[in-house]
Amino acid sequence: MNKLKLSLFTVLLIFSVGCNQQKKDTGSVIHIDNIVDLTHTLNSDFPFIPVRKLTYPFELIPMATLDKNGVEANSWKIHEHLGTHTDAPNHFIANQKSLDQIDLKDLIVPVVVIDIEKKASESSDAELTVEDINLFEKKYGKIPDHSCVMMYSGWEKHLKDSLFVGLDNKQVKHYPGFSNEAIKFLVIKRNIAGIGVDGLSFDPGIDENYTGHKTLFTAGKWGVECVANLNKIPKTGATVIIGAPKVGKATGGFSRIIAVW
């Protein structure tokens, strides 16, 4: 009888310790006080970089309806670089990672936001420069290793007008972006995971050679474009989660991007 009591006590003790450990482990996984959606809703009006015979607006095409088929379903007409989306390194560089090959640990990273809204309000061709990075770090501290650096230019306020693409009468685009020197600095000196912008491209619109894309992707980093609500997250201290679609050989894709802290 005493042996039975001892055995029961031992089992209960082990169970109790196990439950307490499970509670402890579960409670320490992650704690989120704030969450912000950094993704624009994609629809047929969403602007895109115009490339003759290549790019086109998003289209939602009904496939089935509840009335006719007993189920509601749509197909999408979409190219990889529409809406809030992720660019993979193979977008410009041969033999680099495709979207599905980007490691998950590189898609959940610290995020910092560098504000150039004042410059962008004065010039559509404004650039985020190394000087802007230095000024940011003097105020907020060094940009963390393996982080995402977002440029906030306030450009999303132009989403529904022609300034977002900024085509002039020679069909040259005008919108803010990172300078190539800034991207080089972030890749070499700060070992970033990726960068992002609230405009159409992280290269300024006037750079039709996409110099910054090539610099970033040669280093195997990713970029996100048309990011929303960057003015609603802290300049430092948040984590960004890049919900890039896992499509084999993709050079990019519409993504759900969120910030938490």
Kindly give the residue locations of the regions a language model identified:
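C-terminal motif of bacterial Sec signal peptides marking the signal peptidase cleavage site
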Residues: F15-G18
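Sec-dependent signal peptide recognition
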Residues: N2-T10
